[in-house]
Amino acid sequence: MARDVEAQLNYIESLISSVDSQIDTLNKAMIEVQSTIDLLSNGDLASSPEKLISIGSGLFAKGNITIDEDLIVPIGSGIYVAETKERSVERLKKNLEDIKASIQKLLDQRKTLVDQYNTVYATEATRNVK
């Protein structure tokens, strides 16, 4: 196999790996967003006798959470706004759809890269047979 073809295949493999990593990251984000939607949508939090609140670095404190009042939501650049639980759920559902759309775009890119890899590989294999 020619060096330039091998380099091209290695490059395509690295792109596929990068896309796979991005898909994995987005899948994890999607799970987190869905969990938050579920938490805000059902009454389990209110009926739970013990609530643990993350205070960072893997530490938790017992506390009370009231989600019937406005939630404090970051909107960027250190700015926060108050938002109703219902509005937060709507926003999170939109975020979830955006994540799904991004995953689909990445899956399409991955398919294109795999097709490109297979084409380069098959072309080189055909050349070597002759």
UniProtKB/Swiss-Prot annotation:
Matching Pfam families: Prefoldin
Annotated keywords: Chaperone, Cytoplasm
Subcellular location: Cytoplasm
GO biological processes: protein folding
GO cellular component term of the entry, any: prefoldin complex
HAMAP family linked to this entry: PfdA
Similarity field: Belongs to the prefoldin subunit alpha family.
Entry function: Molecular chaperone capable of stabilizing a range of proteins. Seems to fulfill an ATP-independent, HSP70-like function in archaeal de novo protein folding.
Subunit relationships: Heterohexamer of two alpha and four beta subunits.
Protein name (database record): Prefoldin subunit alpha
Species of the source: Thermoplasma acidophilum (strain ATCC 25905 / DSM 1728 / JCM 9062 / NBRC 15155 / AMRC-C165)
